[in-house]
Design a protein with these regions (language model features):
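M16 family metallopeptidases and their MPP-like homologs
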Residues: 1, 40, 47-82, 86-138, ...
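Proteolytic maturation boundary segments
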Residues: 1-66, 211-238
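A common structural junction motif
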Residues: 134-141, 233-238
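Edge/loop elements at the starts and ends of beta-strands within beta-rich repeat scaffolds
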Residues: 206-208
Length: 238
């Protein structure tokens, strides 16, 4: 079942022009947009049906207060990504929106950086850029979907905790990280502390300004076709 509705209202996009263009030593083209986003494009036909897009900014988990980290434990962050969707589209509606297309985008938060990873086929690159734009500017926080995910984790938690490999990893982390409070282990107490309001607070802070972000686009792309799409979607990031 597909949903025939546009992902976004393109008339609301302001866009911004390319302020500077230069060629790199590896055949890449570097565009600097007026909104401060740097775009590095490396056309390659190594995989003819693939385009990989990565938007990255400095910060990552270093920007998250220790008391907020339980909401970003790996399993909880994964359920947020899986269940909550984007804009007005839920995690179950979005795949129907994308029926017949090969495109996706997902936010990431690593230790020192955060951003959005996206990918598509060459023909669906505009959809991937739309999803990246929405993930940045119009994230979706659905308390009901989030709680469903939390209950799913609670249901399997005893099995996870009984796994010897899981216990070994906990003990190893305690020794290796000297009981650092920023290194988390999944348990009942952590699940009680995790909440969607904290995820939303931190997420909106991290993704409020794209100035200084670097976007790499690698794959089977045509620069002249790509340029107006970059200006339209990446150029509309705040």
């Amino acid at each position: 079942e597909s949903v025939n509705e546009p992902l976004l209202d393109e008339s609301l996009l302001k866009g911004s022009k390319i302020k500077k263009e230069k060629k790199g030593i590896y055949g890449e083209t570097v565009w600097t947009l007026k909104n401060g986003v740097k775009v590095v494009v490396l056309p390659t036909d190594y995989k003819k049906d693939q385009v990989i897009i990565n938007l990255s900014m400095d910060g990552g988990r270093t920007l998250i207060a220790t008391e907020d980290l339980p909401s970003f434990e790996d399993n909880i962050w994964a359920l947020f990504l899986r269940n909550c969707g984007v804009s007005k589209f839920s995690g179950t509606t979005l795949p129907k929106m994308l029926a017949g297309k090969s495109a996706g985008a997902s936010p990431f938060i690593s230790n020192l950086s955060h951003g959005i990873s996206a990918s598509s086929t060459p023909k669906d690159i505009e959809t991937a850029l739309q999803l990246l734009y929405l993930t940045f500017t119009d994230p979706r926080f659905d308390e009901n979907e989030f709680q469903i995910g939390i209950q799913q984790i609670k249901a399997v938690l005893p099995n996870i905790q009984n796994d010897p490999d899981f216990q070994y990893q906990i003990e190893k982390d305690k020794i290796f990280y000297n009981n650092n409070p920023r290194v988390l282990a999944l348990n009942e107490e952590l699940l009680e502390k995790a909440n969607l309001a904290t995820i939303e607070k931190v997420y909106r802070q991290m993704f409020k300004d794209a100035a200084g972000a670097e976007v790499t686009i690698i794959g089977n792309v045509d620069l002249e076709t790509l340029k107006p799409l970059v200006q339209k979607y990446l150029g509309s990031l705040p």
